[in-house]
């Protein structure tokens, strides 16, 4: 109960390794791209850089699907979205019919090998587009600085890793991690001042 059932792809009446087929792409993106935008209006300027990948697939597995695995029992955590959508003995029959993920199992325990096969159940689209860098600045007009010893001054605010557009919502898709156990790129904000004397 609560285990994954696989399709007999070759139709020989037995589900085994001969039913395995290629799925999706590799976890190394076939396409990596980036583009920038720059705009200036009067004393204001804006710079943005976007980066993304496409034709990339990764699979949910590891401690995301086996949080009780040997050696990890005291240090693993389970993603709340996965936990909320797994088959559980405490669920009602209706809840279990709607469960997206199989029951959680301990490594080496009943169902652990079956439920952790690479399949379309755990395959995820790894493509994303990210606003990697964004900066907005204001250059103080020279007419204001005329009577000072400052030749020019620009004030700016910038940020890194501000927005990510992706179908995958469990953790940062840029990590390429199968269990979310890698730190994502940090979101950083900076306020600065450039001055020439």
Give the positions of each predicted feature:
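C-terminal beta-signal and terminal closure region of outer-membrane beta-barrel proteins
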Residues: 70, 85, 89-92, 162-197
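Membrane-embedded beta-strand positions in outer-membrane beta-barrel channels/transporters
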Residues: 34-36, 133-137, 190-192
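Repeated loop/turn-to-beta-strand initiation elements of outer-membrane beta-barrel proteins
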Residues: 43-47, 143-144
